[in-house]
Every structure is written in structure tokens, then in C-alpha cells.
């Protein structure tokens, strides 16, 4: 009988210890990120992994700037964009572009040039003249300063990447090798943007004109899209409902990535406010899908 009681107590003690160790193990692991967090919301950008010592050294050497132009890279070092990643750091956020060469990771960064107006327009454009393919087309960063990006087929060959901010910023660009990566860091500033951020819809981004801008004839309209069969309808309508101008123009891509378009439209003088509509028709039901921006007549705005 004594042996039977001892056996029961030993069994209970083992069960308690096992349960406690199991709970302790889960607590040490900490909270787990939600499954498929990189895919929610849709087109959410892949999160950046830990910073290497090479990157940390580069950070200390490269200051943030508001320079409108910058360039670098090596001609022929890569032929494609493999991935765009997002990272949060103390005081700034990062977009990292990974490159490919003949189907494998590139070891160096290809030739690039950057154009930006950090305190004026809220985005930076990095052009890669030697890139002709991409595995990424667009994505949402969802950061406090980094907002989203688009990969666009450039009008003169190659591709460019537009990285949008939520407000004014300073930036820095760092090249990393083995594998080749170009990192773009944004640090927010307290300045106000001088121009509205370009209007964006699901399949259309309009750069010219901006919301509320004063316009005269002829008007240059430019942007990029992924509208069905690369077709973009541009229509200027007066506040009375009268159509002042209408034109259809093709972008230079739509099936592989975003395609650039530009056009010039003519129209008579008008009073008050008009609405510029740019986009395409839904292949499902024929309804309009695109952006609408208010404009006024004249050179002010």
C-alpha cells in the first residue's frame, strides 16, 4: 500500500513539472507574428531581416540629405529586380531593393540615378537603365514615413522605382554587395510638402497635373498605369458637366508591370473648377476605374 501511494505522488510530481516546463518554453519564445504577415494587407512588402555589420558600418558613413539628384552603381551588374523589402529602424525607415542577374542574385548594384524633391513632392524616383524585368511590381510599406512603391517601365528603356512618403523627408542611399542591394532610407522632417502627393488609384497613378493645380491649354498629362490592354482614357469635364477634352493614350506596359504614359490635351478656357479624370474601363462591367483631380483654369495653383 505504501509503495502504491509513493508511486502516485511521483506520477503527480512528474506531471506538474512537465506542465511547468512546457509553459516556460512558450513564454521564452515570446509572441509569434501572425502567419503570412508579409502578405497582409495585399501586396504588403516583405520585412527586412537583421542588419549586418557591413550595413551598420555604411550607416555611420552616409549622412541623410535633401539633394535633388544622385547616381551610382555599375553598368551591367544586374538585369532584374528580385525583391523590395521594408525595415523599421530608430528614427528612419528603409526600402531595400534586391537585384538579379541571369536568374540568380546579382553580386553588385546596377547603374542607377535618383531624382527627388523630398520637401516638395513626397517621393523619390530611382531609374535603372539596365533593368528590363522585375518580380515585384508594387507594394505597401505602411510605415510612419515610407508609404508605398511602384516599379514602372521607363519611357526611354529600363525601369524606375518610385518610393512614396507620407510627408516631407530626408534620405540616403547605400550600395551593398554580395548580394547586390540598394537601400533607400527615409527620415521624416517637420517641413510641409509644397505640392500634393500624386493621385493614386488601384490601377492608375497621375503625376501631372496635381490636385488643385491651375492649367492652361495645351496640358501635359503624365503618369503610369496597369489598365486593361494599356489603354488610358483622359477626360476634362467642366463643373457644368460639359466635356472639354477627351483622349485615349496607351502606356508602354500593363501585363508585366506598371506602364508609363504621357499625352497633351487641348481645351477651351473655362470658369470655376473642372475635373480631370484619368483611368480605364473595367473589363468586367465597363465602369470607370481611375483617378479624378480638381483643376482650375490659369497658370496659378
Name each region found by the language model:
Residues 1-9:
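Bacterial N-terminal signal peptides that target proteins for export
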Residues 17-20:
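C-terminal motif of bacterial Sec signal peptides marking the signal peptidase cleavage site
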Residues 22-24:
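Bacterial signal peptide processing site
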Residues 26, 36-43, 177-179, 190-203, ...:
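Bimodal "functional hotspot" detector
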